[in-house]
Regions:
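Secondary-structure boundary/capping signal
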Residues: 49, 72-73, 128
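A structural signal for well-ordered alpha-helical segments within the folded catalytic domains
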Residues: 59-63, 118, 125
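Phosphate-handling substructures
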Residues: 68-123
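Active-site-proximal alpha-helix that buttresses catalytic centers in soluble enzyme cores
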Residues: 6-68
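Solvent-exposed alpha-helix faces
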Residues: 35, 125-126
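Short amphipathic alpha-helical segments with coiled-coil-like heptad repeat character
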Residues: 39-40, 100-104, 127-128
C-alpha cells in the first residue's frame, strides 16, 4: 500500500501565528498553489478517481480536496492539532512559563484547553 499526504495550501493568516484547528480560509495564491500540487500528483501517476481520498473537515483542506476529486471521505481524526489557548496567538504572546514547559516536554506538554503532541499523535495513529 502507498500513502500520500498533502498539506493544505497557504492561508490567510499572519506569520508566526498558531492557528491549529481554527477554520481559516486559503490565501489569494490558492489557484497557483493548486496548479503546482496537481503537477506533483501527476509525477506520481496517481489517478485521484481510483483511490481513497481522506480530508480533514477544515475548509482549507476541503477546498483543496474538491479541486482534486469529488469522491472523498471527511475524517475528524486528521484535523490539525488543537492548540487551545494558543490558537490565533503569536509566539511572542504565549506566556514564557508555558513556552519553557513546552520546549522541555514536547511530547507530553498539554497546551491549556488544547492537546499535547502525544494526544495529537495518538489521534493520527488511530486514523492509520
Amino acid at each position: 500500500m502507498r500513502l500520500f499526504f498533502l498539506r493544505h495550501t497557504s492561508l490567510k493568516v499572519e506569520i508566526d501565528v498558531f492557528y491549529g484547528q481554527t477554520d481559516l480560509d486559503v490565501s489569494d495564491n490558492f489557484e497557483e498553489e493548486v496548479i503546482l500540487i496537481k503537477k506533483k500528483i501527476l509525477n506520481f501517476n496517481i489517478d485521484t478517481d481510483s483511490i481513497k481520498v481522506y480530508s480533514s473537515p477544515l475548509k482549507r483542506c476541503i477546498k483543496l480536496t474538491n479541486t482534486l476529486t469529488e469522491n472523498y471521505i471527511i475524517d475528524e481524526r486528521i484535523k490539525e492539532m488543537n492548540l487551545g489557548d494558543w490558537e490565533m496567538k503569536k509566539m511572542t504572546s504565549i506566556p514564557e512559563r508555558e513556552k519553557l514547559e513546552w520546549e522541555n516536554n514536547l511530547l507530553s506538554f498539554k497546551i491549556p484547553n488544547g492537546e499535547s503532541n502525544e494526544e495529537f499523535l495518538k489521534r493520527l495513529k488511530s486514523f492509520l
